[in-house]
Amino acid sequence: MASNVVVKDIMQKDVKVVNNNTVMQEVVAIMNKFDKDAILVVQSGKPTGIITVKDVLVRAVEANVPLKTVIARMVYTNPLVVIDENATIEEAAKLMKLWSIKHLPVVDKQGALVGLLDDRAVVYAVPKLMSIMQEFCLRK
């Protein structure tokens, strides 16, 4: 059943992004304001990196560097693993497991950013689908 659900059906569409030169102080402010645990870094509409809360803590705070002196490209994770919007959630789960990641930027055929998929969305999608099918089957 999960093999029929595509990434674009469950991805976050309201993705917060910054550019390579955004100061980390601003990145953290955006993460706090919108309650995001990951921010994508884009250049010309295409994702170039991702900054997670862990990245902020390990690469900036732990290094004891003032956040106003660090820019996104110094902190973000790269190379970036992305997934096509028409891939199945099963394919997404396999990619997440293979690369030990919790966030997958979602791109269209041209490589432009269209969303973000996180591990929670994948985990919640399968039981939700099972529940819908259970209700359907019980009606008969």
What is the meaning of each model-derived region?
Residues 31-34, 39-54, 96, 104-120:
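A glycine-centered beta-loop-beta connector
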Residues 17-35, 42, 82-100, 107, ...:
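The conserved cystathionine-beta-synthase
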